Amino acid sequence: MAAAAAAAGAAGSAAPAAAAGAPGSGGAPSGSQGVLIGDRLYSGVLITLENCLLPDDKLRFTPSMSSGLDTDTETDLRVVGCELIQAAGILLRLPQVAMATGQVLFQRFFYTKSFVKHSMEHVSMACVHLASKIEEAPRRIRDVINVFHRLRQLRDKKKPVPLLLDQDYVNLKNQIIKAERRVLKELGFCVHVKHPHKIIVMYLQVLECERNQHLVQTSWNYMNDSLRTDVFVRFQPESIACACIYLAARTLEIPLPNRPHWFLLFGATEEEIQEICLKILQLYARKKVDLTHLEGEVEKRKHAIEEAKAQARGLLPGGTQVLDGTSGFSPAPKLVESPKEGKGSKPSPLSVKNTKRRLEGAKKAKADSPVNGLPKGRESRSRSRSREQSYSRSPSRSASPKRRKSDSGSTSGGSKSQSRSRSRSDSPPRQAPRSAPYKGSEIRGSRKSKDCKYPQKPHKSRSRSSSRSRSRSRERADNPGKYKKKSHYYRDQRRERSRSYERTGRRYERDHPGHSRHRR
């Protein structure tokens, strides 16, 4: 037993001194200047056990106090959270080192964050899960959630019911993962802890008391109980180990060297020993508190903070606007002026632009209106020409093929007269004779022919013939002498038409001999 204890003490003394950084510090101490690489000086990060000790100003005024929690409520929350971590570690069968690491991380975190803004139970779960991975005894996050669920049922004295895998479970799991990340961020990822358990065994070997099992076990118990206090963020691990041995020896009435005091050999002072012992003894004198009552106090502070923020923004807790007490309140609604009326007599540029457009449109409408059957202006002339052209085109499209062949000359002549009237002067065209039939029926007929179910091929030839006749009439109007020389132009055109009819007739007889016999 003594050999094993000596080996453990030697291993503990040979361990490196690198450990977790102080919460919120994350940098090098004030004495370090940095790291010199070449000609440049870079800032360095020094990770030692001194970084995990908090200064007195942070210990006196914590973030929970700034949120409105009193000191007793904060102390009770710290104790209850550490008790939950210890009980969950026992049910998860974690080693004692892992449970101690989780409690130290819990204490460090809540010296940088408030109990009002962060759930104590969620942070406890996150610390258990993180400590199990740090001490190389990982546990699944589902097991951690089930264990804490079971502890809550035992605390409320309810019948044990398994946790359902519903959306609430998924949300709780995500909250624990976020809490774990938050703990790592606040501690600067410096989460290693140097525990005094091995130091106790080594010091008892030096005092030649390692064979007293009762003294060793009592000192170990005081060490585990001190994890529920904040002594691990106030004092060095060596001082805590000396205080646990001192308190156990006084409790068991075992004399230890006092001239000089034995703890001076290990670098501890009498003031530190007495303060640590007092913290541990206060833990036993504390009354048992109800977690539900503590959670209610935290919720009250949350609501008070939310109301204060809402009043600072000028809103009620429901989000409604606060009414001004100085102005008289009348139940009748106030008439709010439109933005156009509120701007005054000066019109906006957009309204001026719209007014100009309306005036221009009215002028165009007056210019287009016919007076005594004659349209006004050049624009009206061009529109009347386009209408006459459309009216003259529509009958040709709806006409039969035979009629189209006979009327080709007349259409070309009409277009010729139109082109001549355009080129000679800008005088308004003559009014159409009143005896002429209404052309709306012809337009309807052309529309019906267009909407026919089975389109026919002659429609294409109609559009081509009309376009060709228009182009030919324009050529004749531009070059009248060219067509006067060719007196045989229309005669040749009639011959080509007769030949084309003869060709079609022969092809028809060749394809259908019976029909040719019937004609004969």
UniProtKB/Swiss-Prot annotation:
Q: Where in the cell is it found?
A: Nucleus speckle; Nucleus, Nucleoplasm
Low complexity bias located where?
Answer: 408-436
GO BP terms, alphabetized? regulation of apoptotic process; regulation of cell cycle; regulation of centrosome cycle; regulation of RNA splicing; regulation of transcription by RNA polymerase II
Annotated stretches, region: RS: 385-423
Residue ranges under compositional bias (Basic and acidic residues)? 357-367, 376-390, 441-454, 472-481, 489-514
- Specify where the region named Disordered lies, as residue ranges: 316-520
Domain remark in the UniProt entry: Contains a RS region (arginine-serine dipeptide repeat) within the C-terminal domain which is the hallmark of the SR family of splicing factors. This region probably plays a role in protein-protein interactions.
Put simply, this protein is called Cyclin-L2
Any keyword Thylakoid? Answer: no
List, alphabetically, the Gene3D superfamilies matched. Cyclin-like
Report residue spans for region: Cyclin-like 2.
198-282
Q: Which residues carry this modification: Phosphoserine?
A: S330, S338, S348, S351, S369
